[in-house]
C-alpha cells in the first residue's frame, strides 16, 4: 500500500510516520503533487495555525489537488480543521472548503483553553472506523478551535461544549485528536482507516 503523509511544514510528521511504521507500513513524507497523487491513502497532519498551513499548501500548489482527491485521506487535528470552509482565526482564514462548515474558536465554559490532554469520544453512529474502539475510550487532544457538531460528524466530544471529534465526508476523514499520541485506541482507528 502506498501511504503518503502530506508535508505542510507545520505538523508532527515524524510521530505519525512512527505510528504507521508500528502498524507495518513504510509511509512517504512528501509535498510533491506527483507523489501525493499516486497514494492509496493520504494523511494530512497539522499543528499550528490555519493561516500558516494554508500558505504552505498554496505555495506548494496542493490546494486543488487535495480538494479533488478521490483516495481516502485522514486529516489530523489542524488537518481536519483545514477541511472546513473558513477558520475564525485572525479574523477569518479561508480553508479548503471541502465540508461547508466553519471552524470556530472554542468558547470558555470554565475549562482551560487550549483543550489539551485526554478526553473521551462518543459514537452516536456505528461506523467501521471505530471497530475495536470502546465507547468512552480516551484520546489525546491539543486545540483551541473546533468544528461544531454537524451533518458530517460521526463522533463528538464534550469539553464544556460539544464539538466534532471525528468527521467523514465522502473520502475525507478527520480526527480532532492526535491518534499518534492516543495509545492503542488511536492506533486502532488508524488501522481501521488503512483497511478502507
From Swiss-Prot:
<dbReference type="GO" id="GO:0000107">
    <property type="term" value="F:imidazoleglycerol-phosphate synthase activity"/>
</dbReference>
<dbReference type="InterPro" id="IPR029062">
    <property type="entry name" value="Class_I_gatase-like"/>
</dbReference>
<comment type="subunit">
    <text>Heterodimer of HisH and HisF.</text>
</comment>
<dbReference type="InterPro" id="IPR017926">
    <property type="entry name" value="GATASE"/>
</dbReference>
<dbReference type="GO" id="GO:0004359">
    <property type="term" value="F:glutaminase activity"/>
</dbReference>
<keyword id="KW-0456">Lyase</keyword>
<comment type="pathway">
    <text>Amino-acid biosynthesis; L-histidine biosynthesis; L-histidine from 5-phospho-alpha-D-ribose 1-diphosphate: step 5/9.</text>
</comment>
<dbReference type="GO" id="GO:0016829">
    <property type="term" value="F:lyase activity"/>
</dbReference>
<feature type="active site">
    <location>
        <position position="178"/>
    </location>
</feature>
<comment type="function">
    <text>IGPS catalyzes the conversion of PRFAR and glutamine to IGP, AICAR and glutamate. The HisH subunit catalyzes the hydrolysis of glutamine to glutamate and ammonia as part of the synthesis of IGP and AICAR. The resulting ammonia molecule is channeled to the active site of HisF.</text>
</comment>
<dbReference type="InterPro" id="IPR010139">
    <property type="entry name" value="Imidazole-glycPsynth_HisH"/>
</dbReference>
<dbReference type="GO" id="GO:0005737">
    <property type="term" value="C:cytoplasm"/>
</dbReference>
<feature type="domain" description="Glutamine amidotransferase type-1">
    <location>
        <begin position="2"/>
        <end position="196"/>
    </location>
</feature>
<feature type="active site">
    <location>
        <position position="180"/>
    </location>
</feature>
<feature type="active site" description="Nucleophile">
    <location>
        <position position="77"/>
    </location>
</feature>
<dbReference type="Pfam" id="PF00117">
    <property type="entry name" value="GATase"/>
</dbReference>
<keyword id="KW-0368">Histidine biosynthesis</keyword>
<keyword id="KW-0963">Cytoplasm</keyword>
<keyword id="KW-0028">Amino-acid biosynthesis</keyword>
<keyword id="KW-0315">Glutamine amidotransferase</keyword>
<keyword id="KW-0378">Hydrolase</keyword>
<protein>
    <recommendedName>
        <fullName>Imidazole glycerol phosphate synthase subunit HisH</fullName>
        <ecNumber>4.3.2.10</ecNumber>
        <ecNumber>3.5.1.2</ecNumber>
    </recommendedName>
</protein>
<dbReference type="GO" id="GO:0000105">
    <property type="term" value="P:L-histidine biosynthetic process"/>
</dbReference>
Amino acid at each position: 500500500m502506498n501511504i503518503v503523509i502530506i508535508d505542510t511544514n507545520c505538523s508532527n510528521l515524524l510521530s505519525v510516520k512512527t505510528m504507521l511504521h508500528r502498524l507495518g507500513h513504510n509511509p512517504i513524507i512528501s509535498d510533491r503533487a506527483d507523489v501525493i497523487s499516486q497514494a492509496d491513502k493520504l494523511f494530512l497532519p497539522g499543528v499550528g495555525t490555519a493561516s500558516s498551513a494554508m500558505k504552505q499548501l498554496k505555495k506548494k500548489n496542493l490546494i486543488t489537488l487535495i480538494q479533488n482527491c478521490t483516495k481516502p485521506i485522514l486529516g489530523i487535528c489542524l488537518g481536519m480543521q483545514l477541511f472546513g470552509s473558513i477558520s475564525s482565526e485572525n479574523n477569518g482564514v479561508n480553508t479548503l472548503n471541502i465540508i461547508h462548515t466553519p471552524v470556530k474558536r472554542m468558547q470558555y465554559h470554565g475549562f482551560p483553553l487550549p483543550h489539551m490532554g485526554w478526553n473521551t469520544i462518543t459514537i452516536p453512529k456505528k461506523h467501521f472506523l471505530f471497530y475495536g474502539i470502546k465507547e468512552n475510550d480516551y484520546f489525546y487532544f491539543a486545540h483551541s478551535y473546533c468544528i461544531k457538531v454537524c451533518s458530517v460528524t460521526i463522533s463528538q466530544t464534550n469539553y464544556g461544549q460539544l464539538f466534532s471529534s471525528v468527521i467523514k465526508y465522502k473520502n475525507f476523514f478527520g480526527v480532532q485528536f492526535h491518534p499518534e499520541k492516543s495509545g492503542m485506541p488511536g492506533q486502532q482507528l488508524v488501522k481501521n482507516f488503512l483497511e478502507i
